[in-house]
C-alpha cells in the first residue's frame, strides 16, 4: 500500500534453502535449479538422492522475475540471512546451484502508484513433474485464482470442522474438543 503522493518502486527478494533430502549438508551440490523465463518459474530437483530424484519443488510469483541465483554463497556473501550481500547487488547472477551450497533467491520489482495498493502472490510448491509445477504456477500467478482457492479452502475447513460440535459445562473443554 502506498499512502504517499509519489509513485513507489520496490525491489523484493525471495529467498529459501531447498533441501530435497534428509539433510542439508548431503544435498549440497546436488540440487539442480532451472529457471523458465517464459513461465516465470524456478524448479529445483535433487539429482543425487534417489528417494527425492523425481520430486520437483518450485517457486513463482505474480510478477516478472528480474534475476535469480541458486548459489547460497553468492547471495549471502560475507553477510548473513539478516543482511545478505545479494541485496546490495544490482542483480543476482542467474546461476544454477549444481556443485554449490544451494539456495533459491530471486528478485522482482514492483511499482505502486500514489495512494494505491498492489497485491502480489508468492508461490512455493512441490509436484511429481515439472509440467505440473508449471501448470499450477501459471494458474496461481493470477491473483483472482488465488483468492478463489483461498475461499475454497476456507469453505472446505468450515464444512469439516462444522460437522460435529460438542458442548460441555466447561468452555475450555468445548474449545479443545
Task: State where each predicted segment sits.
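Residues at structural and domain junctions
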Residues: 92-94, 101, 119, 139, ...
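Polysaccharide-binding surfaces and accessory modules of carbohydrate-active proteins
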Residues: 2-90, 106, 131-167
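Beta-strand-rich interaction surfaces with strong enrichment in secreted/lumenal proteins
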Residues: 93-97, 107-112
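Substrate-binding groove/exosite segments of carbohydrate-active enzymes
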Residues: 99-103, 116, 155-177
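Glycine-centered flexibility motif
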Residues: 76-79, 99-101, 125, 170
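Short, well-ordered beta-strand segments enriched in hydrophobic/aromatic residues
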Residues: 1-2, 115
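Short Pro-Gly-centered flexible turn/kink motifs
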Residues: 8, 110-128
